[in-house]
Structures are given as structure tokens and as C-alpha cells.
Amino acid sequence: MKVKIKRLVGPEYMTGALRATAGKDMYVVKKPTMKTFKQMAVSAGGVPHSPLRAVLYRIYVEDVKSWVTVHYVRHHIGVQFYVKSQRDDRKNDPMVDRGAARQDTEISMMFDINANSLLTMAQARLCLKASPETRDVMKAIKHQLFEGDEYDEIVGNAMQPPCGWYEKCFEPQPCGKVKNRS
């Protein structure tokens, strides 16, 4: 599996959203301070603030099992997926019989996602109840963020399963890492 990340819209466009919510000049385009950006990503209770939605990433995932992509495309808020087609009319493709295609066939996907939605997705996909293969994809995404700048590192550090934020598990059958929901 190979993961690459490209930031399409940077944190400088978050400043206008921050200022709009405070009733200030929303036409300002400048990077927020690291402290402000971290407060937006790592707020109390693990819920990122809405201006973080202004930051947009394009994530490329290659050679991932088809069934793993299905786990990701379940997310639909703040994200747009582009997954390799299994259509029968793609004759130059070795996977021409859609009905015979195995779920473990390795395919590629790409998705555009805002930083807020990425943090929400990470909560579900880093949970120990997620399949190891699904967790591996999210871990690779998180690792790639650490290869970016300080802003990307903040997003990467904020990517945690729910038990990392709440110290409780909300799964019907928890893994046992923390106590179940009250």
C-alpha cells in the first residue's frame, strides 16, 4: 500500500472563517498562529471547530484491498471519493468480469477531504474495532501528515480513536482498552 497527501487549500484560508465567526474582517488571508490552529484541531472533547473545514487535502491510496475502500467510502460528510471502477466496459483492465472480481483485489482510490472530516474519519478508522487493514490505511495517512509542515503535524497529532479523546468506548462490544460508555 502506498499513500500520498497533497494539501489543496491551506490554513491561510481558515483565517477568514475564524474572523467571520467573530464578526471581524473575513477577507483576510493569512496563516493563523500555530496556537490558534492547534486550538481549532485539538479542542476540548476531541471535536474540531468548524473553521478547520476550510483546510482541504487530496489523499491518494494505491494498492489497497477493494473491501478496505468500502470502509472508507461509508464516510460522506466533507469528503469526495474517487475509487477505481470495476465496470465491465473497461476492456483494457484485467478486472473485466465484475461478478468474478475478488474483494481482496488491490485497487487505488483518491479522495478530497477537509481537515475536520479527516479527524472524524480517523476516530472511526483508528479504533481497535476497525479491521487491521483499515487501521493501516489511516495510520499511513497520519504518518504522511507528519512529513508535511507544522500545520499538517497538528492535524496528524489530533488523529485519535474515540477512546483517545473521551477515555470511553462507544462500541457495543468494546475491545477492552478503556471502560465502556456509561
Predicted regions and their residues:
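Family-specific signature for flavin-dependent thymidylate synthase
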Residues: 1-182
